[in-house]
């Protein structure tokens, strides 16, 4: 199966491959690095760089599944999308996360608080009222005093965040945006 996926990804020059179940529904997204890597290598370049994950939205476009679970916990294969995003940052050494939560916040907190053996921390900021796409960042300014990443809880990109951090710092940029 690994060789088959690798061949298809090479043929189509793609960094990722969506896998569908028998009914044609998205079951998992496999990334190039997952196929070619024999072990998960964690560098510590970003060990002191926090990540803010925006997970407060209602996920209206994902209804009816988000009637039951928040979009941050929508599964892709074996893991919720927000955990996959966190794992991508952890591979670059990130150890500290802040999550902006609102809709079904208790489910997000319970899930992440019960992950066995996780090697990172998550502090939660709850919006008492919706503050917009990035409004809750203002609630975190007393906790974050250095360069940090911001990620939505529902967008996967295959990127080495260490490279992005080096680019950002080398150019003395105020803001660096990666979009998909």
Regions found by a protein language model. Give the residues of each.
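Short hydrophobic beta-strand segments in globular cytosolic domains
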Residues: 26-27, 156
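Short hydrophobic beta-strand motif reused across regulatory alpha/beta modules
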Residues: 27-33
């Amino acid at each position: 199966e690994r060789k088959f996926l690798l061949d298809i990804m090479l043929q189509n020059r793609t960094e990722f491959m969506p896998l569908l179940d028998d009914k044609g529904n998205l079951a998992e997204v496999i990334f190039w690095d997952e196929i070619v890597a024999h072990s998960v290598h964690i560098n510590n370049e970003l060990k002191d760089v926090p990540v803010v994950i925006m997970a407060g939205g209602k996920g209206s476009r994902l209804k009816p599944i988000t009637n039951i679970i928040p979009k941050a916990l929508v599964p892709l294969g074996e893991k919720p999308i927000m955990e996959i995003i966190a794992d991508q940052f952890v591979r670059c050494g990130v150890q500290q996360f802040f999550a902006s939560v609102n809709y079904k916040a208790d489910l997000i907190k319970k899930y992440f608080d019960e992950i066995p053996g996780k090697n990172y921390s998550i502090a939660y900021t709850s919006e008492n009222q919706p503050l917009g796409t990035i409004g809750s960042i203002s609630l975190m300014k007393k906790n974050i005093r250095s360069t940090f990443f911001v990620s939505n809880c529902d967008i996967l990109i295959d990127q080495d965040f260490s490279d992005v951090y080096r680019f950002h710092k080398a150019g003395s940029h105020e803001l660096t945006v990666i979009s998909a």
